[in-house]
Amino acid sequence: MSTNSFPLLQTVNDPADLRRMSRAQLKELAAELRAFVLDSVSKTGGHLSSNLGTVELTVALHTVFDTPRDRLVWDVGHQTYPHKILTGRRDRMPTLRQLGGLSGFPQRTESEYDTFGTAHSSTSISAALGMAMAARQRGEDRRAVAIIGDGAMTAGMAFEALNNAGVADANLLVILNDNDMSISPPVGALNRYLAQLMSGQFYAAAKNVGKTVLGPVPPLLELAKRFEQQAKGMVLPATLFEKFGFNYIGPIDGHDLDSLIPTLENIKGLKGPQFLHVVTKKGQGYKLAEADPVAYHGPGKFDPSVGLTKPATPPKQTFTQVFGQWLCDMAAQDDRLVGITPAMREGSGMVEFEKRFPGRYYDVGIAEQHAVTFAAGMACEGVKPVVAIYSTFLQRAYDQLIHDVALQNLPVVFALDRAGLVGADGATHAGAYDIPFVRCIPNMSIACPADERECRQLLSTAYAQDHPVAVRYPRGSGAGVAPLPGLEGLPFGKGEVRRTGQRIAILAFGTLLYPALQAGETLDATVANMRWAKPLDTALLLEIAAGHDALVTVEEGAVLGGAGSAVCEALNAAGIQKPVLQLGLPDVFIEHGDPARLLALQGLDAEGLVRSITARFGPAAG
């Protein structure tokens, strides 16, 4: 679309421009903003459904609150494209999630309107509460607002923050963006019911004592399902959130500016913790996304007039798909197997497993700590848990990994998806640290398959062990080596030599084996596929060290404490002095961009490996 398609939006350079518009103009602006988001994401790829669902809420927040003086903290942050567009970044949207371009998440270094960096869920209430308390301590009269989804609200961290906020009595507004409930007809019925309730004697009595009691509604009951179920439609003297010390308001239609703006204006004048429940619809305004918000959660480039289409040529099998197929095959063979995921069914490749084995599939919600200890409890009883989790999210359950699984030496398999660089999602989602943080834990092992075939084999190896094992693999596809049928594993803790050369030996951990092999051809170097960061194949290492002048370790993970460090430790323990060049991800957070380009910038493609090795050890002999 041309800029002429968005005449009002083109006049908005910062939120102050919204505050000069009439209500009718704001509605027109919201329509343009939604169309702009759709047009933009269709050209760059990115998160779509969630952003289409927050258009009116974003317009209302920036209209009512004095941003950036008033702080907005967006939980997870993948719903912030409208926020970015309205805060001076409209013309940079073509660079979204590209190297050097806009982040797909809030980023403090990108804009003063991004008050807190988010990407992992359920952090917003804690951060906003901290900001509210800091404002109080400094004598500043400003508001802090946390916008959190119904999924993120299920995490324990969110409830910990609510508990603290109620006691602190801070000037904090928590907005529950509930997009798990249809707007029509339920909200129409709710609005009628609430209109009757608010005009009745019960509401008047509640108001006299300073309480706003709007009664339980289905999303609230769903959110509080761990608490005693209450009869639908029953008016309670206090909601769950009021028990936490909040004044609960809602639910209201999150797509209706005539409801949102007056409600937010009223709340702005209230002191103490406030809780506003808004109901939105993922994909709002784009029928294809409304019908299938999961498919349009994070699409690539597409034609909005056609929608998502299957590629002309079938894509290569991804590591996620390899895992999903292995999980189903192993479950068919062993009825002790159960699959556990913290709300990542699609992303972790467990859709088919849920269909085929519904009684053995456990989605515990956004609750990584619980997921790990839940698996530990099952393992205690002879069940064989497989926890499918992104590498970056396992960080959230580190104490449980150590205390509840490893300390008790329980046989839990951790399928670590998105290991290494993830590309467009950037530093917040990179799985850079799993090798260092897993290999230092007693009883834990970690495997690094080089390709799709090895991924299936090493998952079987991990499953056969009587102690906890993690198998790390990257996003997307690898070298394209088709997995073998059957469930045979590879030897535990053993690597292999893939190329025999002279003078220099390259020890590759994981999918960087293939650029290492290319570099090995150029340098006439020996190349080993080490497969395991722990236990390290010490026998193979010492054999290689004895026959070469220098060693190079290569891994798509943090160099500090990584597999290269394990090699150096093993050589030192054996009393062997040999120069070792450790190549991997440096001690910096690597931003978003094309994964292949990012690896090349870190010198982890074949050409980069040759450059680094030559710079350290000189050119290949002869």
UniProtKB/Swiss-Prot annotation:
<dbReference type="GO" id="GO:0019288">
    <property type="term" value="P:isopentenyl diphosphate biosynthetic process, methylerythritol 4-phosphate pathway"/>
</dbReference>
<comment type="function">
    <text>Catalyzes the acyloin condensation reaction between C atoms 2 and 3 of pyruvate and glyceraldehyde 3-phosphate to yield 1-deoxy-D-xylulose-5-phosphate (DXP).</text>
</comment>
<dbReference type="GO" id="GO:0005829">
    <property type="term" value="C:cytosol"/>
</dbReference>
<dbReference type="Pfam" id="PF02780">
    <property type="entry name" value="Transketolase_C"/>
</dbReference>
<keyword id="KW-0479">Metal-binding</keyword>
<protein>
    <recommendedName>
        <fullName>1-deoxy-D-xylulose-5-phosphate synthase</fullName>
        <ecNumber>2.2.1.7</ecNumber>
    </recommendedName>
</protein>
<comment type="subunit">
    <text>Homodimer.</text>
</comment>
<feature type="binding site">
    <location>
        <position position="78"/>
    </location>
    <ligand>
        <name>thiamine diphosphate</name>
    </ligand>
</feature>
<keyword id="KW-0784">Thiamine biosynthesis</keyword>
<keyword id="KW-0808">Transferase</keyword>
<feature type="binding site">
    <location>
        <position position="286"/>
    </location>
    <ligand>
        <name>thiamine diphosphate</name>
    </ligand>
</feature>
<dbReference type="InterPro" id="IPR033248">
    <property type="entry name" value="Transketolase_C"/>
</dbReference>
<feature type="binding site">
    <location>
        <position position="368"/>
    </location>
    <ligand>
        <name>thiamine diphosphate</name>
    </ligand>
</feature>
<dbReference type="Pfam" id="PF13292">
    <property type="entry name" value="DXP_synthase_N"/>
</dbReference>
<comment type="similarity">
    <text>Belongs to the transketolase family. DXPS subfamily.</text>
</comment>
<dbReference type="Pfam" id="PF02779">
    <property type="entry name" value="Transket_pyr"/>
</dbReference>
<dbReference type="GO" id="GO:0016114">
    <property type="term" value="P:terpenoid biosynthetic process"/>
</dbReference>
<feature type="binding site">
    <location>
        <begin position="119"/>
        <end position="121"/>
    </location>
    <ligand>
        <name>thiamine diphosphate</name>
    </ligand>
</feature>
<feature type="binding site">
    <location>
        <position position="179"/>
    </location>
    <ligand>
        <name>thiamine diphosphate</name>
    </ligand>
</feature>
<dbReference type="InterPro" id="IPR009014">
    <property type="entry name" value="Transketo_C/PFOR_II"/>
</dbReference>
<keyword id="KW-0786">Thiamine pyrophosphate</keyword>
<feature type="binding site">
    <location>
        <position position="179"/>
    </location>
    <ligand>
        <name>Mg(2+)</name>
    </ligand>
</feature>
<dbReference type="GO" id="GO:0000287">
    <property type="term" value="F:magnesium ion binding"/>
</dbReference>
<comment type="pathway">
    <text>Metabolic intermediate biosynthesis; 1-deoxy-D-xylulose 5-phosphate biosynthesis; 1-deoxy-D-xylulose 5-phosphate from D-glyceraldehyde 3-phosphate and pyruvate: step 1/1.</text>
</comment>
<dbReference type="InterPro" id="IPR020826">
    <property type="entry name" value="Transketolase_BS"/>
</dbReference>
<dbReference type="GO" id="GO:0030976">
    <property type="term" value="F:thiamine pyrophosphate binding"/>
</dbReference>
<dbReference type="InterPro" id="IPR005477">
    <property type="entry name" value="Dxylulose-5-P_synthase"/>
</dbReference>
<keyword id="KW-0460">Magnesium</keyword>
<feature type="binding site">
    <location>
        <position position="150"/>
    </location>
    <ligand>
        <name>Mg(2+)</name>
    </ligand>
</feature>
<dbReference type="InterPro" id="IPR005475">
    <property type="entry name" value="Transketolase-like_Pyr-bd"/>
</dbReference>
<dbReference type="InterPro" id="IPR029061">
    <property type="entry name" value="THDP-binding"/>
</dbReference>
<dbReference type="GO" id="GO:0052865">
    <property type="term" value="P:1-deoxy-D-xylulose 5-phosphate biosynthetic process"/>
</dbReference>
<dbReference type="InterPro" id="IPR049557">
    <property type="entry name" value="Transketolase_CS"/>
</dbReference>
<feature type="binding site">
    <location>
        <begin position="151"/>
        <end position="152"/>
    </location>
    <ligand>
        <name>thiamine diphosphate</name>
    </ligand>
</feature>
<dbReference type="GO" id="GO:0009228">
    <property type="term" value="P:thiamine biosynthetic process"/>
</dbReference>
<dbReference type="GO" id="GO:0008661">
    <property type="term" value="F:1-deoxy-D-xylulose-5-phosphate synthase activity"/>
</dbReference>
<keyword id="KW-0414">Isoprene biosynthesis</keyword>
